[in-house]
Each structure stands twice: as C-alpha cells, then as structure tokens.
C-alpha cells in the first residue's frame, strides 16, 4: 500500500511491553504514552495477519524490553508461520544469552542490540544497571547461533560522545555486521533528556572520511558508511529531518492496542483495542481491522516536511 505522500507501507513495528529491566534516561518508549496494557499473543498475531494482507513483509519486535514477555518465542514462531519474510527484534541484550538459540529456532531472522557505552561505568550511568559484560555475552551468543546480521544501536549523547570511536572498534572486534549511531530525539523520556542532545555532523564527517564506500538506505534514506574492516556504520538522524520522514515505511502497533502512524505524534492514531477485545468472530475482526488499516494509511503523513 502507498500513502498519499507516495510512501510504501512495508514494515510493522510491534511494542510487546513497556516494562524494561533497564532505566535508560533517554528512552523514547516507541513514542507511546499510554498504559502498559499487554496485548495477548492472539491479538498480536491477528493484527499481523491483517497487516500481511496489506503487503507488509517485515516485523520488528520492540519494547520496553521484548525479552521480558514469556510468550516471546511463541510470538516469533507465529509471525514466521504467517509468512513474514523478515522478523527481527530490538533488545537490551540482558537476557539474550539464554534466549538466542530458542529465538533462532522459532524463526527470528536478525537482531538489534542496544549498547550505548563501551565501559562498565558509562553503561551503568546510562542504563542504571551494571550489566555491560552480560550484554556483551548476549551479543556473542546471537552471533554464534546465526541471528545475523547482528546490529548494535548506540544513542549518541553528551554522556557517551567520547566513546563513539572506541565503540566502533569494539564492534569490529566483536564481529558484528553493522552499527547504528542514533541521534537523541525528544520523544518519550527523551523530551526530558534533550539537553543531552549532541550533534552528529562532526562524527559523520569523520566516518565518511575513513570509509571506503557510502550508501543510502531505502528506509528513511539513512546514510551508511562501509569501513575498511567491512563494518557498516549507519547514521540515524530523525529529528527535524524531512528526508528521514520522506523515507518512512513503518506503521506501529502500540502496547495498548493502537495503530500509530508516526513516532512523534499522538493525534493520528487508530484505536483498535475494542475490535481485538470485542465479542466478534475472527472473520469480522479481520474485516474491521482491515478498515482500520485503510484509515491509518489514509491519515499517515510525514511529521517533518519541506517548507516550500
């Protein structure tokens, strides 16, 4: 499906829970401010089934921390049984060592691990948890079982800016495929922490100089730089960036049962909780959810636009 701004809808991002065992001071919470209502596995898979009918072929599981859901493996398995080409997950990595093999067997294709520091001290300052070594072990386990490409997310801010290039070195040593250097943006807790925002221009300019190739990713038109080691560094700058919004191909299912068309906005969401929890047959629910998706596509628009 194509929205009225010519953007294809290709990716479904599902928030499985708001609960997290870390306390990152900038967490954007997927742009959600509602209660931590947990949709059932059946609810999630029904929405995913309808989304698949609209041509969506990729699902990203997020949180909170998705590995805290006891039915995570079953959800992954169900998504693959629906025929999704790509099922991935973003995690803090705390429980990954124990879950990596089970998730791989269930059909998880790849994984993003949030690692916002390269030292135990900075890691604890950012997350509130002394778990740096445990997360590193989780990353190694993901690589070992074949959850590739393994990508690391690093939200750049004034507390960790000096660790960026050591983070690149660590990533190369770990053997990960790709890292994302992400701009802190004012969503969720990031609204309160935006004073820690740090401009990525100087960092990106240096990375471009040392790279051997530059690419532009279709999603969000993000710049990607291939280093001599083969590591890919992707720079993610969503804030006040109309180019980023012009390349958005996502729709989100919130933890409290809403179709969210934009990370930054709460004024154009479609509440589908009553459909999911209503006393309807599954066929009727599918029809009503299909209508909800049509409305969501119709009202979907970039948050940041070019001013002409």
Swiss-Prot record:
Entry's cofactor comment: Binds 2 [4Fe-4S] clusters. Binds 1 [4Fe-4S] cluster coordinated with 3 cysteines and an exchangeable S-adenosyl-L-methionine and 1 [4Fe-4S] cluster coordinated with 3 cysteines and the GTP-derived substrate.
Organism phylogeny: Archaea, Thermoproteota, Thermoprotei, Sulfolobales, Sulfolobaceae
Enzyme class (EC, first level): lyase
Binding site for [4Fe-4S] cluster 2: 245, 248, 262
Keywords attached to this entry: 4Fe-4S, GTP-binding, Iron, Iron-sulfur, Lyase, Metal-binding, Molybdenum cofactor biosynthesis, Nucleotide-binding, S-adenosyl-L-methionine
Species of the source: Saccharolobus islandicus (strain M.14.25 / Kamchatka #1) (Sulfolobus islandicus)
GO MF annotations in UniProt: 4 iron, 4 sulfur cluster binding; cyclic pyranopterin monophosphate synthase activity; GTP 3',8'-cyclase activity; GTP binding; metal ion binding; S-adenosyl-L-methionine binding
Family per similarity comment: Belongs to the radical SAM superfamily. MoaA family.
NCBIfam families per the UniProt record, alphabetical: moaA_archaeal, PRK00164.2-1
Magnesium among keywords: no
Protein's name according to its UniProt entry: Probable GTP 3',8-cyclase
Residues in Radical SAM core domain copies: 4-224
Its EC number(s): 4.1.99.22
Cofactor: [4Fe-4S] cluster
Pathway: Cofactor biosynthesis; molybdopterin biosynthesis
Top-rank taxon: Archaea
Gene name per UniProt: moaA
Alphabetized Pfam families for the sequence: Mob_synth_C, Radical_SAM
Binding site for S-adenosyl-L-methionine: 64, 114
Residue sites binding GTP per the record: 13, 60, 90, 151, 250-252
Reaction(s) the record says it catalyses: GTP + AH2 + S-adenosyl-L-methionine = (8S)-3',8-cyclo-7,8-dihydroguanosine 5'-triphosphate + 5'-deoxyadenosine + L-methionine + A + H(+)
The protein's role, per its UniProt record: Catalyzes the cyclization of GTP to (8S)-3',8-cyclo-7,8-dihydroguanosine 5'-triphosphate.
UniProt keyword Metal-binding, yes or no: yes
Example GO BP: Mo-molybdopterin cofactor biosynthetic process
Binding locations of [4Fe-4S] cluster 1: 20, 24, 27
Coiled-coil ranges per UniProt: none
SMART domains: Elp3
């Amino acid at each position: 499906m194509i929205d009225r701004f010519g953007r294809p809808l290709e990716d479904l991002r599902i928030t499985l829970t708001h609960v997290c065992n870390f306390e990152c001071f900038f967490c954007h919470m997927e742009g959600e401010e509602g209660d931590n209502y947990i949709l059932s596995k059946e609810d999630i898979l029904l929405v995913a089934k309808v989304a698949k009918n609209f041509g969506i072929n990729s699902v990203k599981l997020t949180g909170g921390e998705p590995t805290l859901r006891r039915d995570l493996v079953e959800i992954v398995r169900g998504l693959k049984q629906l025929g999704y080409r790509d099922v991935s997950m973003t995690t803090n990595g705390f429980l990954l060592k124990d879950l990596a093999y089970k998730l791989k067997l269930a059909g998880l294709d790849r994984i993003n691990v949030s690692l916002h520091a390269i030292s135990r001290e900075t890691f604890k300052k950012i997350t509130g948890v002394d778990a740096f070594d445990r997360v590193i072990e989780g990353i190694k386990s993901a690589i070992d079982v074949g959850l590739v490409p393994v990508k690391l997310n690093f939200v750049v801010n004034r507390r960790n800016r000096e660790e960026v290039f050591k983070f690149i070195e660590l990533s190369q040593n770990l053997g990960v495929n790709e890292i994302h250097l992400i701009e802190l943006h004012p969503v969720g807790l990031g609204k309160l922490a935006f004073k820690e925002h740090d401009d990525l221009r100087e960092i990106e300019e240096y990375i471009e100089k040392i790279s051997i190739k530059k690419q532009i990713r279709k999603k969000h038109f993000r710049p990607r730089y291939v280093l001599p080691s083969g590591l890919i560094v992707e720079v993610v700058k969503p804030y006040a960036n109309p180019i980023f919004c012009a390349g958005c191909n996502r729709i989100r299912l919130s933890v409290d049962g809403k179709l969210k068309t934009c990370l930054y906005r709460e004024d154009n969401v479609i509440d589908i909780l009553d459909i999911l929890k209503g006393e309807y047959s599954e066929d009727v629910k599918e029809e009503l959810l299909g209508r909800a998706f049509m409305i969501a596509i119709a009202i979907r628009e970039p948050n940041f636009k070019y001013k002409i």
